[in-house]
Amino acid sequence: MSDIKHAKLLILGSGPAGYTAAIYAARANLKPVLVTGLQQGGQLTTTDEIENWPGDFEMTTGSGLMQRMLQHAEKFETEIVFDHINRVDLSSRPFKLFGDVQNFTCDALIIATGASARYIGLPSEENYKGRGVSACATCDGFFYRNKPVGVIGGGNTAVEEALYLANIASTVHLIHRRDSFRAEKILIDRLYKKVEEGKIVLHTDRTLDEVLGDNMGVTGLRLANTKTGEKEELKLDGLFVAIGHSPNTEIFQGQLELNNGYIVVKSGLDGNATATSVEGVFAAGDVMDHNYRQAITSAGTGCMAALDAERYLDAQEA
């Protein structure tokens, strides 16, 4: 373990919130240090197509957008550190953070650690993770070329995953516990076009009862009808779970005020909107937002957190 590194402002996370905070903080001469976390670029790097980022009307990829954000942050001399923070001590200043590679202290902290894919929680699902069960179609979809797969979920992510896989797999079985989908209309329209083409098969009013498999991996699913309770089996080679995300806040439990895992912020009308229950600690992006969860809103709160941190540090030095 190397010596402790001190930063005036430390930013945790390298998604839209973290990189935007870094850009604004660097331009304010705060000399931010950004710790990337395990997944550099965050969730967005697993998104194949983005068509609602202002200015990129021709459509862009998540990984491409995050690479440009990284370059933007580096242009203003943000120091990027490839490490993962596994423990923090926010009880006194400077704040202490303990990484896999290095330890840090800082005068102000912006938490932009994002969220991770949520799984259903079945033992059989856990047993086949990495052997047919995944939460990322763009990461693992190519393994299932011309093979049948399933997708579980009813929101934008599930429909996007199904549409992406429809261009790879032989058949995509989209499974949803309700009788209608919550996705945006443009995605629903594309979904039903693929249904008409026979590329996607809908299984509504169904829940996952069991992941079936053998020593080689997933071989199928057992579904339960939510109205009748009847069970049915599907033969397929892969399952993609798209039922939402959980905020990455485990290391902050007992140190910050949380609400269902999300960091509570002040959201004040007089500024300081991203301030947490600990003075000098700010939160941005999916780690504090359970309603909107968009790349653009994450970036916006990253900007707000940088401005809040700048005001806080200025007041400390006054």
Curated annotation (Swiss-Prot):
Transmembrane segments: none annotated. Keywords: Cytoplasm, Disulfide bond, FAD, Flavoprotein, NADP, Oxidoreductase, Redox-active center. One of its GO terms (molecular function) is thioredoxin-disulfide reductase (NADPH) activity. It comes from the Bacteria. GO terms for cellular component: cytoplasm. It is found in: Cytoplasm. Disulfide bonds join 136-139. Its main location: cytoplasm. Its EC number is 1.8.1.9. It holds the Pfam family Pyr_redox_2. It catalyses: [thioredoxin]-dithiol + NADP(+) = [thioredoxin]-disulfide + NADPH + H(+). The keyword Cytoplasm applies. Binds 1 FAD per subunit. FAD binds at residues 36-43, 286-295. The active site is a redox-active disulfide bond. Belongs to the class-II pyridine nucleotide-disulfide oxidoreductase family. Homodimer. NCBIfam families: TRX_reduct. PANTHER family: THIOREDOXIN REDUCTASE 1-RELATED-RELATED. This is Thioredoxin reductase. It comes from Haemophilus influenzae (strain ATCC 51907 / DSM 11121 / KW20 / Rd). The gene is trxB.
